[in-house]
A protein has these predicted regions:
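Basic/aromatic-rich interaction segments and small domains that mediate binding to polyanionic partners
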Residues: 2-67
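Long, low-complexity intrinsically disordered regions
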Residues: 69-71
Length: 71
């Protein structure tokens, strides 16, 4: 199921992340589009400022501004 609770919230990587679209260095910024569970794992789809959109694991990112989270 797609969870859009945090859609539009800014995030950043907390360490180097290698993806199929390209590498994301530590402190790369992006915007969360949605979260989804796939094969028992939670994934977060992020539109990165580097020009591509790829899923990452929640432990690879942190939310930049909690004031934007819609509950």
């Amino acid at each position: 199921m797609i969870d859009r609770t945090r859609a539009g919230v800014r995030c950043r990587t907390i360490r180097f992340v290698r993806t199929v679209e390209g590498d994301l260095p530590k402190d790369a910024y992006g915007t969360i589009r949605y979260e989804i569970e796939n094969l028992g794992r939670l994934l977060v789809l992020v539109e990165w400022d580097r020009g591509f959109t790829v899923p990452v694991f929640p432990h690879e990112i942190e939310v930049v501004n909690l004031a934007n989270v819609r509950l």
